[in-house]
Amino acid sequence: MKLRTLTLIANIAALPTLAQEHEHGRVSPVGALSAKPRISSEAAVANPNAASRKNAEEFIGAVERELPIETEYGNRVSWIAANFITPDTDWLSAKVTAELASTTVARAKSATKFDGVDVDPRTRRKLELLKRSLVLPAPEQPGASQELAELQVRLGTAYSTGKVAHRGNQLTLDDIEDIMRTSRDPNELKALWERWHAVAIPMRQAYARMVELANSGARALGYFDTGALWRSWYDMPADGFSRTTERLWSQLAPIYRNLHCYARARLNERYGDAVQPRTGAIRADLLGDMWAQQWGNVYDLLAPKNGSLGYDLSEALVQHGYDAVREVKVAESFYVSLGFPPLPESFWSGSLFVRPRDREVECHASAWDIDGKEDVRIKACLRVNADDFYTAHHELGHVYYYRAYQDQPAVFRDGANDGFHEAIGDFIGLSSVTPIYLHKLGLIQQVPGEEADIPFLLRMALEKIAFLPFGYIVDKWRWQVFSDQTAPADYNAEWWALRTKYQGIIPPGPRPPDAFDPGAKEHIASSTPYMRYFLATIYQFQFHRAACRIAGWNGPLNRCSIYGNTEAGKRFNEMLRLGASRPWQEALATFTGERDIDASAIADYFAPLERWLTEQNTNETCGW
């Protein structure tokens, strides 16, 4: 999802790319360098006025020889920088980022030289992917790539190394999140929330300069701004993508408002009007999560008054002696049950599973494809709890996606779109938390009856439905920033305008004039595009519904687990193997039979909960 060194390559040049969003090439540096000399990608377009089909094919051939070498180089540097955060690795990261960003920008511009050339469809798609492979394109002027890279590293490091004082201790974000999961003291929650958000205050000036540089680079490539570039990634016009996301949100807003209404009433019952009124928006610090993006940590406050899930997965994992490695081993066994191969030994020896005690690392979970062959890894600071049990299944989704498309040409070694890459593991995650699966693992003694469905669905909604508006507004805010609709002086005010409008969330108190609260979210600090997570939340339910149909499941979607169903696994793998070689609409149809993203699967999954919430909210004044 995110990491400090996503800054390094993926966020400035998505080809080559790294970590869980993307994959890398298969040609080894030794093999490539020992081969006889070939034309380079620069030489292939040395005379753009003479561009021809042959030139285009030579250009793509050169790119696909060069790209795997560069990608492995960048990945290895990035892995070290993420696992050993020091001024030296920051310096190295910035240098490599600048080098690879310049190369990727040059390739994108070279690809435009062939816009009018008649080439075969696969070559045309490769050219288009190269043109839109950038996240933050640097301008061509001398020093711009280096400055942009240094800004990215500075922002990412400020976030990754941020700490706050609390009760005589210096707390990391992980420490703060542990407290926010369980504390029900509104004064403590407010203090921690405000102190963490203060970490982002120094970022605003650097962020504004980064936006200025990236926009200059995007305009040089023919885009109106960087936001327009980002919206061009989805095999449809940029304006069409905006309309698609608006359509999806309109499908989802009613159930979110219902959930918000219910949660607000329960919080009011706990804290009273002085802390959380029965009407209006919800305080951002009361929902068990620093960003109020997922509310599962306050399930104890929101649980139905009648009915129980019947088990605590976190407790069960501890009681059964799980550790971080076992969580990942069990996740691997799920994919193997679908017909996928076991992970190579290098995965187990090369990955980081727990936070080391001797150094600073970027702890947010991420998946890596180091060399486009067998060297796949995850980097995570896993703990034994339900969240990280799910995380293990999620991250391996990225890893198995890398392995599925590793035989594609280098330019096609990526997800059908970035939402697909995030959705794969979450789709498996939907099966991994079902009581049927947990019972097969021996983690629970019996599968609860239908009386447990509402508690189960409410827990799921607090993670999935609660996330949707946040997943939608992060990039809406950035699109406004990139388009200059939101000036630096208004960054924070507009952030909260969007959060209030779509999420119904407000800060716990007045914000200082120099606040830069968006920067308190890692994806803003690292410039990781975020709409992928909104899309992924929708895709995962669409995948789940299709897989359950393939498996012959006839019951409620929330009770379906595809564990052990090789037919569903076969169809799933057919989609994964395509990588980016076909538009995402075709990849989607390969697995689901549907060509458009559709939120109706979410409505199907949560239909029993929607009816229950409507009943619970009968006497409430919903909305804000």
Predicted regions and their residues:
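Post-HEXXH active-site segment of zinc metalloproteases
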Residues: G227-A228, S232, Y402-F427
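Boundary at the C-terminal end of the N-terminal hydrophobic targeting segment
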Residues: T17-E21, A35
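C-terminal, non-catalytic "cap/extension" segments appended to globular domains
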Residues: V45-A56, T89, L130, Q294-L309, ...
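N-terminal helix-rich structural modules
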Residues: H22-G25, A44-E212, G227, K521, ...
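Bacterial N-terminal signal peptides
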Residues: T7-P16
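Active-site scaffold of zinc-dependent metalloenzymes
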Residues: N187, E194, D358-N385, A392, ...
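Post-HExxH zinc-binding segment in Zn-dependent metallohydrolases
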Residues: F241, T245-I255, G415-A452
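Active-site-proximal, well-structured secondary-structure segments within enzyme catalytic domains
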Residues: N169-D174, T182, R209-K379, G449-A461, ...
